[in-house]
C-alpha cells in the first residue's frame, strides 16, 4: 500500500512556478527522499502534503486521505518537522512534548509514558527538564522530531532535518532517523539538499529540479544507470583560462558532461585509467599545470548533472535567495 501519493501537482507563487507536475508515491514503511538544491520545490511539495498549502491543481493522498478534501483527517495521521522550529524555547523539552500531546487529545498516564519513551529514544532523557533554549543545535532538532512523534503518526515529514548542523551533529541525526524508522514503524519522507544524506538514509530518492521530478529510484540503481567513471582534475594557476581548459577536455573522445567546479574540471568517461593519460596530455599541451587528478564511481551529484545538465552545488548556491523568498 502507498502511504503517500502525489499526482501532477502544480503550484505557482506569483511569477515563480514552484511545482510543475510533481508525481511520485511512497510505500508504507519506506524512507523516501526528495533531493534537490535550494528552491527546487521540495518544501512546497511537503507543504502541500501536510495540508499547509493548497495546490493549484493535481491530487495528493496521505494515508489514503485526500489532503484537500479531508485535511483534518490527514493532520491526525502525520507528524511534521519543519525547517524552522516551532519549539517554545522558554519551556523545557518535556513541556514542549506534553503540549503537543494535549493538542492531539492525549492526556494522563498514556501521554506521560509516550513522552518518556520518545525522550529516551532520541537521547534527551537526561535533558528533558532543561529549558530548550540551552539545547545544542543537534538536541533542538532531536526535540523537533520527538515533538512530531508524540501522537504516534503513521507518516513523518522531515523538511531539511539537518540543515544548520555541523558534520558531527548531522551524522548523529542520521543514526537517529534510521533508528526511528525501525522502532516506530514509520513511513518517512525527508527533503534534503545534502547528497550524502539522501544516499545514506533513503530507500528511494526522487531528484527535484525547478519544480519537477527528473528521475527517481533507489540510490544504487540511479548511480548504476550511469556508465563509466567520474574524473576530477584540479588545476593550478590558470591565468583566467578555466573555460578554455573545459573546452580542451570536451574535445577528447569519450569525455561527457564536462563542467567546472572552482578550479576543478570534472568529466564522465568510460574508463578512468585509460582517460587520465589523454586528459593530462591534452591539458599539458595547452599549458595547464595540474595539481591533482582523481577518479570515482558515479555519485548522486553525477546523476543530477546527467538528468538536468546543471551542477548541483552551483545551482544550490544560486537559488538560496529564491528558497528563502518563496519556498519555506
Regions found by a protein language model. Give the residues of each.
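Conserved ABC transporter NBD signature motif
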Residues: 58-69, 74
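Conserved ABC ATPase "signature" region
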Residues: 98, 102, 109-127
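Conserved ABC ATPase signature
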Residues: 131-135
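Conserved catalytic motifs of ABC-family nucleotide-binding domains
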Residues: 152
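Catalytic Walker B motif of ABC-type/P-loop ATPase nucleotide-binding domains
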Residues: 156-159
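ABC transporter nucleotide-binding domain
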Residues: 175-270
